[in-house]
Amino acid sequence: MTRKSFALISLACSFVTCKAQQEVCFSIEGNPFEQEDAFSEFTHYIDVLGCFHVLAESGVSDSKLLHVAAVAAELLDQDEDGQVDDPSIEEALSTGQALMPILNFEGSDAEEMLFESYNGSGIAAVLYNEEIDPEQPGHWGADATVEEVLHTINHVGHAMVYPEAFSLEPNSSLLSEAMDVARGGQFMSVPDAYPEEAWYHYDDWTCDYECMAIEYLYWGI
């Protein structure tokens, strides 16, 4: 399987909050979902291009919230005209209620309530306060924003809109086929050891097959 199996996305991110050609400026609002148990502990919010929600709990700075929103906007609107580049992805994200939660720390009240009460399909990743650094956008070990936002867009968007290419289940897509080759076989969970011919060795024991596929797509991009 060649790299042509992937629809690669260019990540030329400028990480600004207002775009040049047709301005897209973010306003930080109160939590519009506070009546829902899953989101009751979050305090501030940004709507990105009408199809991607970013929610943060108390203690997360406005600058970090704006940074996450800006990354999402750049990934969705790379020509910076104020419109999502792929209308089908926009519709899928909107219908699926794509949402990125920003949590203060692992085990916070917001995390506990979210994990206990959420039963939707629009959350594919979370970000923690310490994982966000607007001064080092995308820097490995300092800022995980690009990775986690992209996971959400891929999971809620691309996997739904283009299943022949990006479906995450075993034997379902070009992506799953390519990953099986890269791992040296089809493994539903992390093997004790990868075959010698494998070149994708992701080893998070909490990651199931679909999780591995999302991670593989990220590394492919």
Regions found by a protein language model. Name each.
Residues 49-189:
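Acidic/His-rich structured neighborhood in mature extracellular/periplasmic domains
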Residues 13, 58, 62-66, 208, ...:
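Generic detection of long, well-ordered alpha-helical segments
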Residues 173-221:
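Metalloprotease/metallohydrolase-associated module, dominated by Zn2+-dependent proteases
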Residues 45, 89-94, 207-211:
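A general structural signal for short secondary-structure junctions and capping/turn motifs
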Residues 21-46:
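N-terminal low-complexity, Pro/Thr/Ser-rich intrinsically disordered segments
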Residues 1-21:
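Bacterial Sec-dependent N-terminal signal peptides
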